Amino acid sequence: MTDLHYRCGWVALMGPPNAGKSTLLNALLGQKVTIVTPKPQTTRNQIVGILTDDDAQTIFMDTPGLTQVRGRLSKTMIQAVWQSLNQADIIMPVLDAHLYIRHPEFLDRDLAPVAQALASEERPMIVVVNKVDLFGDKSRMLPLLTRLHEMWPRADIFPISALHKDGLADLVELIRKKLPKGQAQFPEDQISTAPLRFMTAEIVREKLFMHLRQEVPYSVAVDVESWEEDEERGQTVIHATIYVARPMHKAMVIGRAGQSIKAIGTEARKDIQELVGGKVHLELWVKVREHWTEDTAFLRDLGLMAE
């Protein structure tokens, strides 16, 4: 029987790098569906997370951070953002309050072009002001909130802390009210559209970001080459290759006496076991593939570029 009051729709999370979009999505779902690191520009693909309750199904799209385009990979990531916007019923920019209060001059640099591009939008828009937990004196936020109202006069401006989950229940309620009426598009127990292989590769990439310094994690890619169920041993056997752009990066990923790759593999295996709900045997290999970020065919093979 069709529920005429049920709501269902797509919400595009967008904004500058390191604003907390992925942290917010994981917090809204109460489960990890996208990787989170302290480094900006971690997300490369559109990640879909699904929140279902008795009254609504909200389909969130976590997108790469909006930044200046540098190279084919970066261009592909920015294209993913605008493709998500075309699909969205609600547009939800997410920004780092702490950054813009400390550096108000960055506000027009980062957000004015986005506000201008969306000026004619008639779809609902919620501007999420994240990381408000970093301010004891909330009055310091008033100039920022005032400027955001000027930039997005029709939008709801909503302060939250994704890390501490402050304000999230009210945010979910606001989103639900703005969703169009319609029936659920996914089963009620599904929380993401990402295949297990993709999520496994993302977990390995997250650990690379956590262990490697400077520019190295930005020049690595992970490809899960095989996935087999070993019923005799009761485990999932996964072979993944880490591609790096330079020989020196390979040495850094492996580490002295293999200590770095061992730590990356151990931490990744624990998260993958939680993901699959069972024992995992993970083997990681490191290969050099120079200029892979400019290789269109390779980017397509990795799922980083549409066919």
From Swiss-Prot:
InterPro entries referenced in this protein's UniProt entry, alphabetically: G_ERA_dom, GTP-bd, GTPase_Era-like, KH_dom-like_a/b, KH_dom_type_2, KH_sf_prok-type, P-loop_NTPase, Small_GTP-bd
Topology of this chain in the membrane: Peripheral membrane protein
GO-annotated cellular components: cytoplasm; plasma membrane
Region G2: start-end pairs: 41-45
Annotated GO MF terms: GTP binding; GTPase activity; ribosomal small subunit binding; small ribosomal subunit rRNA binding
Gene3D superfamilies noted in UniProt: 3.30.300.20, P-loop containing nucleotide triphosphate hydrolases (3.40.50.300)
G5 as annotated region, ranges: 160-162
Keyword annotations from UniProtKB, A to Z: Cell inner membrane, Cell membrane, Cytoplasm, GTP-binding, Membrane, Nucleotide-binding, Ribosome biogenesis, RNA-binding, rRNA-binding
G4: annotated span: 130-133
Protein name as catalogued: GTPase Era
Species, as recorded: Desulfovibrio desulfuricans (strain ATCC 27774 / DSM 6949 / MB)
